[in-house]
Structure formats: structure tokens, C-alpha cells
């Protein structure tokens, strides 16, 4: 499976992928990641405001992955995620479960499949208690309650909250909290994808 990751933002994005690593790329550039056969899942996200030295060590304002240019661990929250899982078919989503940093879209090459996007700038409407430098955090990450994190008593019955509704209203096709199962999409196995920052 091939992922073409494209930067349409008016600024540099340091893309990250598990698997895949990471890459600095400017507006208009593309980074291609080929997943090995049998790869069960992958996630991609964009990092902003990064500085790295010649050895690839440094830090990012949002989405930082342990201070490495080439990521081997998940990114720091908040970060808009493109998630992919392979089983009987492909399942994919744009996730705001870990918050939002930059707009993102997933475009399958199979045009019969849905192309979910989060094009809004959620940072512009982020409640002050969720606002952080470079992004808008999720209520679960900040408040850590079972209700916001869909844990314990809420594991099987976890309705949307006022916070997750802010994300959902801005980006109806994105996964807005842990139990927002309306926002996972399926496509035939063998499909390739492009992931676009600032679609």
C-alpha cells in the first residue's frame, strides 16, 4: 500500500509516519511511504514549528515524537491523525481523538470510497481550557475524566460531549472522540491513498 503525503499548507510541515519515520517538506512537496506487505496498521500526522540538528535530533511545537526527525514513537498531543488499519478490507479515518493541530484529508485512489477531511482551522474556535501552543487538545487529554475518555462506566455508553461537539461541528467527517464510530470508512484492500495537509 502506498501513501503519498502532500503539503498544501503555506508553511513547512514535518510529516511523521508509523511506520515511515519522518520528513521535512515545504508547500507543494510530496513524501511517498510504501507500507510493507502485511502491515496491519499505520498512522500519519503533521508536525509544526520544528528545529532539528544535522543528526535529526530536535523538537517540534506540535506533534513532536520524542525529539526525532524520523519518528519511531507516536507524536505528542494534540495532533490531527490519519489512521489506517488493514484486515478483510482497509479501514481509515481522520482522527481528532488526540486533538487538532493542522487540517488534513485522506484521499483513496479508489474513487468509490469516501475521502474524509478536516479542513477547518479548529485552533480558531478552540475553548481556552483546551488551547495549547500549536494546537487544540482533546477534553480527554486535558481533563482526564472517564466521561471524556470513554473509560470504566462510560466504556460501552459514551455520548458526545460539549467539547467533542465543537470538533464534530467543525469537521463532521472526522473522529471527534473515542466512541465516534460514524467516522471510520472502509475501502477495498489494495487501495493506495494520498494524505493532504491543508486540503
From Swiss-Prot:
* Top-level taxonomic group: Eukaryota
Q: Does the keyword Secreted apply?
A: yes
Expression by tissue, per the entry, reads:
Expressed in pollen.
The family database entries (InterPro entries) matched by this protein are listed as:
Osmotin/thaumatin-like_sf (IPR037176), Thaumatin (IPR001938)
Chief subcellular location equals secreted
What the entry lists under Pfam families is as follows: Thaumatin
Q: Keyword annotations for this protein?
A: Allergen, Cytoplasm, Disulfide bond, Endoplasmic reticulum, Extracellular matrix, Golgi apparatus, Mitochondrion, Nucleus, Secreted, Stress response, Vacuole
Give any Gene Ontology cellular component.
Answer: Golgi cisterna
One GO-annotated biological process of the protein: pollen germination
Q: Which SMART domains match?
A: THN
Please state where this protein is localized: Secreted; Secreted, Extracellular space, Extracellular matrix, Pollen coat; Cytoplasm; Nucleus
Record keywords: DNA damage included? no
Cystine connections: 9-198, 50-60, 65-71, 113-187, 118-171, 126-136, 140-149, 150-158
Coiled-coil ranges from the UniProt annotation: none
Q: Which family does it belong to?
A: Belongs to the thaumatin family.
User: What protein does this entry describe?
Assistant: Pathogenesis-related 5 protein Cup a 3
List the taxonomic lineage.
Eukaryota, Viridiplantae, Streptophyta, Embryophyta, Tracheophyta
